[in-house]
Regions:
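Secondary-structure transition/capping motifs at alpha-helix termini
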Residues: 88, 146-150, 202-204, 235-250
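Flexible loop and strand-edge segments within Gram-negative outer membrane beta-barrel domains
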Residues: 1-56, 67-75, 116, 121-132, ...
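Extracytoplasmic loops and strand-loop junctions of Gram-negative outer membrane beta-barrel proteins
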Residues: 58-67, 119-126, 177-183, 214-216, ...
Length: 258
């Protein structure tokens, strides 16, 4: 059997200034929204002796109309799964799962020099890009067999590999040119696992499960990247015993110790 799934998305967004809500609540309702002052793009702004008061309540309409913040993103998620039963040994099957998650996006921010948040710095501009992709590979073999209608074995062993990558590039600048900031940030890591499991049941009543995992990640130091995790569990299906089968008040009863 082969299953394939894929989903993509492209989005374009424009973001308003969230501070406009608080500014609308605090703004003096007796003042006009527009007063023709060309210094602020025709919008009203508080002044003292002809100078802009940066700590005064901002004009909420100007905050919404004069800020430009747009973001564009592309996302793609997909996986393919192959499940194969061997003809020469029908109790044995192989399962392979390949997956990916990719995303890229850009964001632009611009405050003109006439805007309430850009006036002091002669305007502001910013740019950010984000690239992210994750890859996944899972593979395991599973063997299940019944013997004499009393013994059931289910044995599985596999390998898992994951890759995580993210990079961000960011730049902001006041248009007077005296305070530019930028940075590039990248992260990359891997997660690798080897795992196995053995299930045994006798007469579908008495159960034993043993598992073993060996996980390693590049996020830890070289001396501490790997961890071994064993576990054992015992089970007893009490409902399958003769003294419980005729007890209709109990639909299922199982004791498990691990």
């Amino acid at each position: 059997n082969i299953n394939f799934n894929a989903k993509g998305m492209i989005s374009n967004n424009r973001f308003a200034d969230t501070g406009a809500i608080g500014a609308a609540i605090a703004f003096d309702p007796t003042q006009p929204v527009m007063n023709g002052n060309s210094k602020y793009g025709g919008y009203f702004a508080w002044e003292n002796a002809g100078e802009f008061i940066s700590i005064a309540t901002k004009n909420p309409v100007a905050m919404l109309q004069q800020k430009k913040e747009e973001a564009n993103s592309k996302n793609l998620v997909g996986n393919i799964q192959v499940d194969y039963k061997f003809h020469f040994l029908p109790e044995l099957r192989a399962n392979l799962n390949l997956g990916m998650d990719m995303a890229t996006g850009t964001q632009d921010i611009y405050y003109p020099k006439e805007s309430p948040l850009g006036y002091v710095d002669n305007g502001k501009t910013g740019y950010e890009t984000i690239d992210k992709y994750n890859h996944l590979l899972d593979f395991y073999l599973q063997y299940a067999k019944d013997f004499n209608e009393k013994h059931h074995f289910d044995i599985m062993a596999g390998y898992s590999w994951q890759h995580f990558h993210r990079s961000t590039e960011n730049a902001y600048n006041n248009l007077n040119g005296d305070n530019p900031t930028s940075y590039i940030f990248k992260t990359e890591s891997y997660l690798i696992s080897f795992f196995g499991r053995v299930n045994y049941s006798f007469m579908n009543r008495y159960l034993i499960t043993a598992t073993l995992r060996n996980d390693g990640t590049s996020r830890f130091s070289k001396d501490n990247r790997w961890g071994l995790f064993p576990s054992v569990a015992l089970g007893w299906k009490i409902k399958e015993e003769g003294f419980m089968k005729d007890v209709d008040a109990v639909s299922d009863l199982k004791l498990r110790l691990g």
